[in-house]
Amino acid sequence: MTAEQPTGELSLRIERRRDANGGDSSSVATSQFHRGALRVLRPYYADDSGQATYTVINPGGAYFGGDTYQLTLDVADNAALRVTTQSATKVSKTPQGPAHQTMHITLGESARLDYVPDQLIVYENGSYRQDTTVDMQPSSSLTMSEIITPGWSPSGERFTYTELRMRTEIRVCSELFAIDQLRILPAEESVTGIGFMEGFTHIGQLIFVSRMVAQPAVADALAELVRTSDTHSGLTHAGRPLPLIDDAPVCLVVRSLAHSTEAIARLHEQATDIVKDA
């Protein structure tokens, strides 16, 4: 691919529309574009809420050195979108330089996005960078899930990849609200011991930004779930005050360490259900 054209590109705009007979409304794609090594499957609706679920696929099977991927998700007023993947995202050896994914998300008034991909697996000598920006409204709701797994290596060691960098910037009405950063550099420092992985192998992070998580009952239910889960997890209140924005959303973050993808995925699913049912 040339410098001007990414390895894979995907753009979706989701709007709320009534059916042809004027019945119940659903969220549908009014604009869709893909090119290169990214595709989406036909959407489906898991329940009667009208939220559309799109599954992103990478026909190439993995991210390689120097690959660049660009995703743009635009969810209009009152629309709801869930984005997942067909399988784990795998980052192979990257001698040509890091694989890099950028994602820009725009959420309208009362719009909702659940971004819940399968796990990210970074293999030996792999390097991966991810930059996400979110522009949302006070009434929008955002859920973002990530599970990071070290890939297999011939030596049997767990952390043989070169680097992992993930940055998420969230703005409300263009005002900076929160920045989340994760940086793991096994090639430069030990990450297995006390103060980092604590002997665990898998990392999870789950970000909620919504007025719903401001409800004490929701926060208490999340705290109890985290406390009793079979992961080593914590619940954090994040985001800076936005005094000029009436009824601003609240940000809660669940961070986890575990010995398996399944343990974190189970926690994320249960936590997401608590917020969705609020």
Per-region residue spans from a language model:
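A short, polar/proline- and glycine-enriched secondary-structure boundary/capping micro-motif
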Residues: 39-42, 92-98, 125-127, 153-157, ...
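Basic (Lys/Arg-enriched) interaction patch that binds polyanionic ligands
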Residues: 125-126, 131-133, 144-147
